[in-house]
Swiss-Prot record:
InterPro entries noted in UniProt: Cyclotide, Cyclotide_bracelet_CS, Cyclotide_sf
Superkingdom of this protein's organism: Eukaryota
Record has Disulfide bond as a keyword: yes
Cyclopeptide (Gly-Asp) crosslink location in chain: 1-30
Annotated protein name in UniProt: Cycloviolacin-O20
Notes concerning its domains: The presence of a 'disulfide through disulfide knot' structurally defines this protein as a knottin.
Gene Ontology terms describing biological process: defense response
Disulfide pattern: 4-20, 8-22, 13-27
Function: Probably participates in a plant defense mechanism.
Coiled-coil positions: none
Family of the protein in this entry: Belongs to the cyclotide family. Bracelet subfamily.
Maturation and modification: This is a cyclic peptide.
Keyword field: Disulfide bond, Knottin, Plant defense
Organism: Viola odorata
Length: 30
């Protein structure tokens, strides 16, 4: 539920390396 400061409209979350995932076109962590 914490925004990672990255969008995932066109590309996947690069922040997935630190546990972020794409939700509603924005990368979130928990």
């Amino acid at each position: 539920g914490i925004p990672c400061g990255e969008s995932c409209v066109w590309i996947p979350c690069l922040t997935s390396a630190i546990g972020c995932s794409c939700k509603s076109k924005v990368c979130y962590r928990d």
